[in-house]
Amino acid sequence: MDSGALYQNKTSGVKFTLDYNNTDWYNNPTHGTRQRLTVARDWGLLDESSTWTAIQFRHSQFFNLGETEKARQRVLAFDIWTSDVPTWNSTSRNGDGVEAFHRAPLFEGSTLGGLERQRAFPSNRFHDRSAINYTAEYRYMPKWNPFPNIPLINTLHIPWWQWVGYLEVGRVADNWSFSDLHKKMKVSAGGSVRAMVYELVIRVDVGVSEEGSEVQMFFNHPF
């Protein structure tokens, strides 16, 4: 679905998250796994939106490839993310008698494009009832670190930086169907430069797709 459609992004509800983290370091994991199940629900109690339910699941896995003569750290990182809004096609009439769909807002729904998933596309480029996205990253941390020797920048305390290559494959669909979600999937490919600045990972991602290219700047790894 084209994200240019008008959606209500104001909501009042609750979110339940079950997070199991078996990695060595949450800030920059090198091995282990992490799973996260999230259920968000809005009962429409404040009449700010119609009721809706959104379910998301994510599995991330990391493999430490060890050091080399020039690499301080090499990591293969994989991520699977999927989302569904089971109330998507149900409707009800609000106080004004207008029929409203029970659909989650963009920031809680099944969206691709932007800072975390399908980074070669604009934010919320694809939006529908269901979505799936696969990501693979190769994270290379060189032993060479020029930042402590650069005036002014050396005050930022940058102990390491990374060069990252990534590939993403995913799509949205009007129902959660394994076959539908794996047809004509969208692809993002690109690279990233990341650095630890005051205990926070800062990243600049550059990605290309069939629709062009995007530059995404944010903090923390995408997963």
Question: Where are each of the predicted segments found?
Answer:
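Composition- and surface-driven signal marking solvent-exposed, interaction-prone regions
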Residues: S50-T53, A71-V75, P148-T155, S177-L181, ...
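Solvent-exposed loop/turn segments connecting transmembrane beta-strands
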Residues: Q8-N9, D42-S50, N124-A131, K183-K186, ...
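C-terminal outer-membrane beta-barrel translocator/porin domains of Gram-negative envelope proteins
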Residues: G4, V14-D19, T23-I150
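Outer-membrane beta-barrel "beta-signal"
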Residues: V193-V197, G212-F223
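Outer-membrane beta-barrel transmembrane domain signature
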Residues: G4-A5, E137-F147, N154-A189
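Active-site lining segments that contact anionic ligands and/or coordinate catalytic metals
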Residues: V75, E116-Q118, R129-T135, I158-V164, ...
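Residue-level detector of the transmembrane beta-barrel scaffold of outer-membrane proteins
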Residues: T17, R34-R36, V75-D79, T135, ...
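A short, hydrophobic secondary-structure junction motif
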Residues: K15, A40-L46, W81-S90, W160-S177, ...
